[in-house]
Amino acid sequence: MNFGTMTFYTILFIIAVLLLLARLPIIGFYIRAVYYGLCLMIGGFVGGIASIPYGKSANNHFRMFKIFQFMTWPMGIEFELRNAEILNDEKPYIIIANHQSALDVLGMSYAWPVNCIVMLKSSLRYFPGFNLCAYLCESVYINRFSKEKAHKTVDSTLHEIVSKKRKVWIYPEGTRNANNELATFKKGAFILAKQANIPIVPCVFSTHKFFYNQAEKKLTGGKCIIDILPEVDSSKFETVDELSTHCRNIMQQHRYKLDAEAANLNL
């Protein structure tokens, strides 16, 4: 048996063992979680390399997202996007979404508007592969632990909105939250909307719990609903707090509705 044949059968054996191990709940969870992380790294790196000839552009996201969706297809996670036409508005707006887990990166790829940048926590600039794509997609990093740096980020993002008519994707909870109740919203997204005098577009994802649960070591195939709600006119609210509270309330109520629907979809 020559070296090539041995290598081929060795690879087949490893794949077979991994497939068998993946059927064990806990081991399967870690295999799928590692696979998803690799998809993020490789998808971001390949998407980044493919985007170099085009230079820095917010629309490089679509190249990376297509690669990422293709790579994660074997995981069996499906997203149903509703009211997508709201995203097609050419004017700038802030899109806010609830943030549950790392799977939100895959979810956002199905609801991404043209000429949009994302505000990311600063630690992600060190995530291999992903950071290259984020750089070429003109993503914005925000330091949540430094008010001074956070304010500078908000100011630079405001300039992007005004000068390039950008849309900005923000997770107002500020961190992952797998609970049924949305966390208290941070003010950054709403300050931006008020200062730029642009609307807010709420984006609500149904719960991931039917296919992903960190505590239970569960990561399987499943279905998630993404619903784009009508835009909220920021100019109709006197204060940032009023705007933030209103947006959180409508998103929370809609989240309950979507979770009930998702329960039936994931039977």
What is the meaning of each model-derived region?
Residues F68-Q69, M108, N131, L158, ...:
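Short amphipathic alpha-helical segments and helix-helix/interface helices
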Residues F3-T7:
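Hydrophobic structural segments
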Residues F8-Y93:
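Membrane-anchoring hydrophobic helices of lipid-metabolizing enzymes
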Residues L81, V140-N143, S234:
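Short acidic-hydrophobic, aromatic-tinged amphipathic segments that line or gate anion-handling sites
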Residues F8-I11, H151-L267:
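Non-catalytic C-terminal accessory region of glycerolipid acyltransferases
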Residues L40-R63, P74-M75, D89-K147:
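Catalytic core of membrane glycerolipid acyltransferases/transacylases, capturing the structured
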Residues L81, I95, V118-M119, I226-I228:
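Generic preference for hydrophobic
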